[in-house]
Amino acid sequence: MDPIDEQEVNVYLPDSYLKGVISFSETNALGSCIIGRPFLKDDFTATTSIRNPLIEHKRIRDTKLVKNIVSNPQYRLVEPLQMQHELLSVLSPNFILHTANLRKIIQRSVDITDKKLNPILHILNLNSPNQEGKVSERLTRLIKKHLSHIPNWVSSWYNIWVNLNNLLQEYRSKEVIDHNCVLTRQLSGSFIHVVMSQYGVVIISKKSKRYTMCTYNQFLTWKDLALSRFNANYVVWLSNVLNTLNEGLGLRCRLKGHLLSKLYISTDIFLSSTSNEFYNVVKEFEGFIMSLILKQTEEALFSTRFYNNMLNNLIDAIDRARLEYLARCANSAARINLPSTDVMIASLGDILSLINVLGESNLNNLSELYFIFRIFGHPMVDERKAMDAVRDNCCETKFLTAKNLASLRGAYVYRIIKGFVANYNRWPYIKTRVCLTPTWINYLDTNSCPSLLEMTEDDFIVLAGVHFIREFHIPKLTDLEIILNDKAISPPKSLIWSCFPKNYIPQVIQDEYARRYCRAKAPLKTRRVLEFYLQDKDFKLDQLHRVVVNQDYLNDKEHIISLTGKERELGVGRMFAMQPGKQRQVQILAEKLLADNILQFFPETLTRYGDLELQKILELKAGLSNKNDRSKDSYNNYISRCSLITDLSKFNQAFRYESSCVCSDLLDELHGTQSLFSWLHLTVPLTTIMCTYRHAPPDTGNNYNVDDIAEQSGLYRYHMGGIEGWCQKLWTTEAIALLDTVAVKGRFQLTSLINGDNQSIDISKPTRLGTRTQSEADYDLAINSLRLISAAYKGIGHKLKEGETYLSRDMQFMSKTIQHEGVYYPASIKKILRVGPWINTILDDIKTSTESIGSLTQELEYKGESLMSSLLLRNFWLYRLYSVDLKDHSLCGKQLYRSLIKVLKHLKRCFNLENLGECLELFLNVPMQFGGADPNVIYRSFYRRTPDFLTESITHLILILKHFRRDLEFNKDNVSKAVLSLLEFTKNDSAEFVTLMRDPQAIGSERQAKITSDINRTAVTSVLSNAPNEIFRTSALHYSSTENELNGIASGVSPVYPHGLRVLYESLPFYKAEKIVNMVSGTKSITNILEKTSAISYTDIIRATNMMVENLTLLTRIMKPGADTSLDPDTIVITILSKIIRDKSWDVGDIIGVTSPSPVSCFKVVYTSTLQNNSVVIERYTTDTYTRGKRGPTKPWVGSSTQEKKSMPVYNRQVLTRGQRDQIENIAKLEWVFSSVANIDSLLNELSTMTLGLSLRKCRQLFPTYLSLNFLHRLSVSSRPREYPSSLPAYRTTNFHFDTGPINKVLTERFGDEDINLVFQNAISYGLSTMSLVEQFTGVCPNKVLLVPKLQEIQLMKVPIFQGGFNLQSIIPIIRQQHMFLPNHITPAQYIELFLSSKQFHSRINLKHNNRFKLVLQKDYFNGENMIETLSTCLAGHWIIILMLMKESQGIFDKEWYDGFVTDHMFLDLQLFLSSFKTFLTVFNFAYLKVGSNIEEITGNQANLLELLDLGYWKNMYKVFSETKVRLALLKQDLSFNSVKNSSSFRHWFINSLQEVQCTSVPWVVNVTRNPTHLKGVLQYMKMIESGMIQGYSANISSVLSIPYNYPDMAHMMTKIIRNRGHMSYDYPKMKKSLTFSMTDMSDSYMLNLFPKVECSYMSGYLDKLDDTLQLLKKPPVGRKVPSVALPWHHCNRYNFVFSSTGCKVSVIDMLPKHFRRSNLKVICFIGEGAGNLMLRAVLEVGGNIKLIYRSLKDPDDHHVPVEFLRLKPCYPYIDTGGSLSLASTDATNKAHWDYLHLHWTDPLNLIVCDAEISGVKHWLKILHRWYEHMTSCKHCLKSEHDKYLIIKYHAQDDLIDLPHGVRLLKCNICLGSKLSGSESYLLIGLGLSNKLPVYSEVLHSKLLLAECHQFHHPKYLDVSGINTNIKSLIPMLDYPITYNKITTLLESVRELSSNKNKNTMWIGRNPVYHNKWLKRKYFNILKWLKYCIELPAFRMDYNSFERIEMLYPNLRDLVDSVSTSELKKVIKVTGILFRSNTM
């Protein structure tokens, strides 16, 4: 670079480093400088750049070409956008050559892919040839066939890109030599000339006689556009080609490429005729596509509204853009006349119709298009205009309503209170008790909190008056993690001028600036937070605390807010601003306090969730909102649901002081600060806000002080609103509180996920449908709630954006992923668009480039998308990179190419390959881990991973090699040779793993990609050790010495176990030191510093490289396998290698880490349906029971995974800082892992005293209650290695079921089979990938895949048991030297404060003096022998804890509690389980649920509590108990379990069984200090022992027993022990035949007498009616009064039966003709039989062992098992329930149904009984038709000569209806037992001449006759169990016999139910409101009715009496209203029992 006179030098960084943002001001400055008058806009930038241009701009101006053009009047100046179309349609003359190149590259990428594909298909056994040859050959043939004519829409974009790219490359290679060069070139084959430099580009078109100036960045963007378009089109073309072979091979979208190309071009043309402002119009396309998506997913109601809205927006956008343009271009040179609106609308119409056609109404296409829109380029961002937009927002007047603000504050208070109650079991301390109403004072005293459903709006107003007292501490010392986020900051006000280039600011200011700059302290000069600290030598850790306490931040003279031009969204007036370091610090602190203390009360904020958790939540939401799955609640209301996705305009700026201080004041009170949380609103209005973008300087008027400069565009004061990103968290929490008020107002349940202004809200509300359809109900709810939300926001000054607020019934659209009906629509093309921009930006670093190509294309494999598309795209670019770009690289010439050739020659020699082409194919297929021959990269890929990763890589390498050379022998030498031939360096035999101990986990799995390599680390440490700031200096020093010190401490402990060391490592200060070094080394600041200091010396590099080489050569040493055994040659090496690595990991010399073998080499994939021995089975769940939409090759499901949480004790945790909490946990972990080491206590004591200042004894009380057993287990299992093919873990969804059971022999004995999933994660992932790939390559997903281990060597390491001792001496100096990294000591005051607030601890501390209590829990329950007992009691404990949890979390995100417990239940002792369940229930009822006042009452109440439990609980429990292995085990103990067929019958069985057992002794969980974790529970339990309720206990209490882990973990552990000891053949306890049903021994005749006598009348005389008699029949019966009764009295004699009672109104045998002989009946078939009561009666009447065929329509909520039949005849052998049939084949109108009737028995079906409820006569006749068909065509039924009959239920119609041909009605039966006003009759139908069906009036006629002349009969005998069940399901507290006294006492207690102390009696359906309102009312009304009935005098059981009874009862209306219809029937059943004694 020529030395230029210092006065002129003014180098500035071009803005190209702000990728993607194109600066308007810079373009304007460049253009104005060149033409000498304003270019784009007449503003101060233009003025300055004309007056004092930058030297770089002058250079371009003075180019000869540019001068000529500017002075030539024929050339017209336009703005850059207007050249876009012309530039992007330039095809170079050698188009054919480029296309040939393209073809060649694709051809090669197909070859390379083929080499990878073959091994994959080989492993999957898919490559066996068929007619057309192998799969892989078919694929390659297919693509090569299409290659001959690559469509124009692919090749032209490639050509355009190559053209632009060549120009750029040429410029870059010139620039390397001459930094200031300006390149002038003609774009090949066009009339376009380009003058290019890094500081600006001039484009001149000789064709259209136009020219323009733009920034370098704009040019890059155009090149990237061409590239992105090529990429998108290439993938679309590939994918379409692949899909022709087999659907699912390509991507799921079916876009049409030529249309895509047309879309790009027409949009370009549209933009090129307009101006920069019109990008806003293009942005509206998104809305259009969204409206198309809604059209697909939603009903018309939802989508049309959005669609119309959107079209209006488009027109508005055009008008707005036009006005903006006219305003901007006044007086500027580049002004044009815009086309008229009509013309624009016409061209827009074309574009939109193109989009419409492209979408093809296919969601996959639309979601792809939705995201593809970045492909049209970026607008230029005008920084000044952005500031003006912000200023306008501020000046807007806001109207806030006081009521809204008050209720917002109230809701915020409510959230905090609720959070405290949930987390700390208490209210926060409050000052103003006065303002609370009595109700709230009551809540305060009981430390409880109502749920939202119980609140009203006034409650919020009441709470708004609450003030808090301080609860949280501000940390005295700054936590270093606060400091270390490397954000940008602004210079202080006095140095603000450093932002602008010198030329742009007046000389006066320049001089003054220079003077001040010299005087300023180092930290003030920097622009990044991190350096601000690094440079500060006076830095004290308590500084920040002082600033906050003294409120220095409120009037800081140096405060300025500067806006930079970096952000993309500036155009719309989003202001991203920076402030000086000091203020930034305060802001960071405020955010941190919020995050640590407050966010936990707002679970809806997304800031808390990681990606996986978020995905899990979204999956749950998708499942919940699925519209195919809508449910009704227990009151038969339809639960309407809708989703809202809202977007608020200018969310942050709309928050004024008024609207945020209502909440921030509360936070200040809680933290004891003054206005810390509203600092923003208090300081910002007083500061100047200024645009500091370098090309947009203010007009200073020579004032140095910013405050004196007049306001202007880009500089203003008195900013009122918020600022983007500064208080995000606070505002998010406010938004959540606001939604609480909305939920209360609208009375619906609302769950939301909120991130600032982006909200996804789900709303549900039970409603009565009335005449509306479900979708109308949903729509009403959506509109109503949108109105409420909109109003609520308006009240606090916010506005909802119309176009971006979507209403939907069932679509999730969060964080830009679209989900519908549970199917995920991942926009794959969007992901690879990024493959464009970096290809050149990072081209300097080929290695990084290859890595990112690999990882970005891998996105295409994600979620089971297309492997082929991914491989072909990746290989295309890799091949181009290595074979084209490397040959002449713009920065390093041929150097890299030479080294590549060197590697290829290695390979060629090593494997005798034929040519270098083949070597390149091999090289590009070697897993990227081998880093393309660069030792640096290969090291980078190894040091972050475990050796598994190594095993995997080598496996892959071998697989691929095997396909290159069939004859290659694989032995250790060849493997080593293969690895080494890829690397160029020599090896060293005596190497050790040098860096390993830095990261004991493995070779550095924790150290993410933050550090590029060790070279960088070395540099960072050396820079840091010179930093002025002491903390950074010492951390660097400590960091370098860590390794030896840690080894010193643990040298005496054996074995040296990496995971164990990790725990120790984290509890010592190194960890923090390393964290600092790590964090620093990843930041931008450090890169800047490194550049400045060039701290990396040559020796450092040599050292680091040597270290890597040594580490790598160690691999070759490890790879010396032992004795060869006879196995597949390729497996052997790897498995042995794997084993060796594993063994070595114990050897102190080389710590490597634990490993598990690679699934690819250890499993053989088998597809069969028969089960093989010893294999992992992966199978699909059956598809007909799916819940979340269909899925197949083209629709993957949403997948996810979860994490468990440790439980913490309930002390007052806010007192501790995060550091202290972590340290406590670390010490607890240490104790846990190393408990077997001799001097562990001394070590812990040392640690806790020195790091926390507490003795170990005190510290123990703060330990987490228990650590999960899994924690240790996780230590023993390796981290999961790479799967193959790489990225499919997300395929792990609900769709598959793994059974690793068959491998049990080897593994499960050691690890219960629930954990095996953890161990076998890699196998499972592998299996799932297999599934996905098979699905892609064959188009069919296999139902089952077996992974058969090739060898028995899959063995897992046990967790080590440590011996020896720690070296304590070495710990003390470490802690003393590095004290600054330790948490503060916990002071005595803090320690006391910890326990003060927690009531539980009060009692715990008092109990310390009570020695008796300490004694109580000394003894262990588990003594080594009583495994089964321990298991059974722990499982009971587990289910009770779940019961408690379900009560507490009335939330929507409930987990599936039964996961992982199936195996444990196999070994249950049922009797013991039930006894302990009963004990726990009693204890917890009393202690926690506060039921009843004394123990006797509770015991009675248990069944009631269980009856009222949410069905979800029983479903969960039934899921476990119905698993085959558990079921079989339980049947051995209790036969009656056989009758359990679904969750409701399970509930019935369980509750009944519970009543048979006594309470027993149970163990209690204690923590390390042997303190009970369920304190109240234990105390209550002791009371029970004292009162002698528990069997086998004297009053001596000293032996309450304990267990050390929580119940589930203890149970798991027992299961493991049982299996290890081979208790598989364990003798189950012999039990009596049945625990519960004594009546299973009832004789058939006894049972028959449980049915009442049936009263029927048979109609005849209707057989051949004439028309005139018909007219008479249609008239209503004369003279008969229909008895008017409101209650379903026909149920009054059915009280013996629970689930159904059809058998009480009709008898099958009575219906049959007299001549029919019972002996003809071998089998009866029942259709639509429900619970099977009629079937039971038939069996009893026919007698003998008759065979039954039972079919009932499968409906998830209804019985499809004959539960009533099984209740009374549990073990009936001859019944075919059709359990395995699908939904279709249980529907009698379907032919399939009739085909499957002879599934089990081939006897003829002489009698079929159909009791189905059939909608519509049409369907009813269809069944008759099907019956006739079957009887006349079925070969089994034709065998019999007897008559064939069908008994069928029929609802008579008003009109005469003919029976179908060949079907004759023989007899019509009308029952007294059916509904009086109904039209029900039972018909006997045979074969014969067809006749007519009875009409409604006839049936009614007969029924009334019956009702008048006959009465109901009681059954002879009673079934007390059934009766009790009926009574309890209505009123749990009541039982048989019912007496007057029982009823009156109950009535009294129900009256008291509302009083507060009994608030928690029961709960239903997780909704406390129902409980408070309905329960009380329901019980009350039913009891009143029963009381009335029991007092009645004797009467006849007929309708006259019933009518009288109803008329005399005054409260009938109340009774009917408070009870649902099904409950009403039960009420009548119970009433019937009362009548039994007093009927005549």
From Swiss-Prot:
Signal peptide: none annotated. InterPro entries: L_methyltransferase_rhabdo, L_poly_C, Mononeg_mRNAcap, Mononeg_RNA_pol_cat, Mononega_L_MeTrfase. It catalyses: RNA(n) + a ribonucleoside 5'-triphosphate = RNA(n+1) + diphosphate; GTP + H2O = GDP + phosphate + H(+); a 5'-end triphospho-adenylyl-adenylyl-cytidylyl-adenosine in mRNA + GDP + H(+) = a 5'-end (5'-triphosphoguanosine)-adenylyl-adenylyl-cytidylyl-adenosine in mRNA + diphosphate; a 5'-end (5'-triphosphoguanosine)-adenylyl-adenylyl-cytidylyl-adenosine in mRNA + 2 S-adenosyl-L-methionine = a 5'-end (N(7)-methyl 5'-triphosphoguanosine)-(2'-O-methyladenylyl)-adenylyl-cytidylyl-adenosine in mRNA + 2 S-adenosyl-L-homocysteine + H(+). Its cofactor is Mg(2+). For RNA-directed RNA polymerase activity. Mn(2+) can stimulate de novo initiation but it is inefficient at supporting elongation of de novo initiated RNA. Mg(2+) binds at residues 647, 757. Pfam families: Methyltrans_Mon_2nd (PF14314), Mononeg_mRNAcap (PF14318), Mononeg_RNA_pol (PF00946). It is found in: Virion; Host cytoplasm. Coiled coil: none annotated. GO terms for cellular component: host cell cytoplasm; virion component. The keyword Methyltransferase applies. Residues 1694-1884 form the Mononegavirus-type SAM-dependent 2'-O-MTase domain. Residues 640-822 form the RdRp catalytic domain. Its EC number is 2.7.7.48, 3.6.1.-, 2.7.7.88, 2.1.1.375. Keywords: ATP-binding, Host cytoplasm, Hydrolase, Magnesium, Metal-binding, Methyltransferase, mRNA capping, mRNA processing, Multifunctional enzyme, Nucleotide-binding, Nucleotidyltransferase, RNA-directed RNA polymerase, S-adenosyl-L-methionine, Transferase, Viral RNA replication, Virion. One of its GO terms (molecular function) is metal ion binding. The active site is at residues 1273, 1705, 1811, 1849, 1880. Substrate binds at residues 1728-1732. PROSITE patterns: RDRP_SSRNA_NEG_NONSEG, SAM_MT_MNV_L. Residues 913-1395 are annotated as: GDP polyribonucleotidyltransferase. Contains an RNA-dependent RNA polymerase (RdRp) domain, a polyribonucleotidyl transferase (PRNTase or capping) domain and a methyltransferase (MTase) domain. Belongs to the paramyxovirus L protein family. Interacts with the phosphoprotein (via C-terminus); the association of P and L forms the polymerase complex. Responsible for RNA synthesis (replicase and transcriptase), cap addition, and cap methylation. Also performs the polyadenylation of subgenomic mRNAs by a stuttering mechanism at a slipery stop site present at the end of viral genes. The template is composed of the viral RNA tightly encapsidated by the nucleoprotein (N). The viral polymerase binds to the genomic RNA at two different sites in the 3' leader promoter thereby initiating either genome replication or mRNA transcription. This is RNA-directed RNA polymerase L. It comes from Murine pneumonia virus (strain 15) (MPV).
